[in-house]
Amino acid sequence: MIVTIINKVRKMAKGFLPFYLFTLLPLLSSCSDYSDYNTVPSAGDQPSANKTLWENISSDQQLTKFTALANKCNFAAVLQSPRFFTVWAPVDNAVSDAEYNRLMASDSATILKQFMQQHMTEYNYPVSSALDSMTIVSLNAKHHPFTSASFDGFSYNAVNIPSTNGVMHKISGLSEFHNNLYENIDDLSGCDSIKNYIQKYDEYYLDVNASVIGPLRDGKQTYLDSVMKKRNNVIRTIMRADLEDEDSTFCMFIPNDKAWNGAYAAISPCYNYIPKLDYMDLSLKTSVASSTKATDAKAAKAAEADGELQDSLTRRNIVSNLVFSNCYQRNWPLFGKGSFAANDTAYTTSRNSLTDLQEMMNHTIATNEMSNGMTRTIDSLDYRSWQTYNPVIATAYPEKALKVTKLTSHSIPLDSLKGRDSLFAHVPKMFMQWLKPATSRFFQYVAVDSANIDGTTGKPEFNFALRNVRSTTYHIYVVTVPAQVEEPLADVKPYYLRFYLSWTDAANKQQYTVLPQGAKSTIEMTTDEGESTATMTYIGNPGCVNVFDLGEFTFPVCYYGLDAYPSLMMMHTKSYTSSSNRKKYDQQMRVAGVYLVPKDYNDIWANNE
């Protein structure tokens, strides 16, 4: 059904019911379903029982400030209406002159939200000795503890003052208003970069449930009063946090402009796109790696990148890991409960695990309480790049295999590898987190078998598509697996491998490189310790899981989010027409993964080991 808004739409910047709605309330009768809430305890002969809330408040000499503020925001009509409310009214000496003057100098919407609605709720909430602690949701959707002794921690001056349309309790303090984390974005100072970025994606929508429905006109729904609320796609889809939810508790890092600019400068180079990007389409590739040219199997259509993509992804990566929920105990140090130890992990609302949060906390220059959590304003946002905007790129299954009779996937139970540590003797510690992860019960790899046929000249080959590569420097590794992982008594033979990389330069010219760069085709080497000469051919340690180090490589353009990708070709360099070759070298290829490790992450592991 088409919705027509026939009255002037009033946009609500904070998403709460506008006070104008209450002016319609005299037209509405109290709901009989809530009669239990609309009856105050017997008032006896109390004269206030025959007066409205407004009449009782405006005539009370202890509530002159409350009265003046209600008049300033035109709220008297609401307190005079038949709709039933409970009011917790701060007495005059509970409201400091400074706060009173600030409110009186504010606009009506501010007074309404920060004072009137802060101290009121619908229905009847009397004070009695039987009252246990409960939470009151005030008209501005804030939460307040309510007991027989206090409201929001402030004791009572008087309780259960009856009126024809509600009940009033006078309290000795002013319930302090706090923005929620979403509302706080609009009030940020010195943090214009994050403020402007988030506000850019604010959108307003009609809250049908809160609006006053009108008649149908020409088959179209109309509204007597329309309530507009605000939501934000950055917060909902990138941060994945309900920052307006008063029932949740979050800690949010707020980078000031210095921190934002520093993070932008660090992240942006990883997303260096070119308008059109040609690349090798592995589905079209037919020649073996050793005979392939740079422009072979060129994709029919170049991948295209929008001119704003680099800026958009940079900003997205800045904000995506700023919010943490109190639901996870590992996050509690952010809320002042304990402290982070070295390598402790915190968990963001965007479902990312971060370490070294203490370093970010050390750059806190201000903390502020919010109605649903707290903020930490920071002057440096130094993410660990590999945990956020520049992760390790890993792939285990080839996009294409050439000269292959059979390609199979293998999952070996980790329990079967217990006591066989010699298999992994040459594997750096960095790789054990991926090869034998705590979240899996299996060691996995893929294998090809094409060389077991006597007389074949085929050289089996894996072609890996390296998707989502950033424009940065990686250390490239390939992990191979020996037959002994699955067959302990198999013949112990080394591999004999070469590697080729297809990539595109910043001028959109396709390139084809032997790895490692600068390799000498006339030299062969093993992975024995002490050998460091760059060579074209790799011969692994026989009978072991090998991590072949193909060296550093800098990709000049970014492929993230595009159809395009660079490709890694891995092939046997020996044919098997010779029985001596079949006896000397492994006739299968088994690969547990190709890893592109960002240089800064690789350097940390190299230094530690």
Where are these regions (language model features)?
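Bacterial Sec-dependent N-terminal signal peptides
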Residues: 1-53
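Mature, structured domains of secreted/extracytosolic soluble proteins
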Residues: 31-609
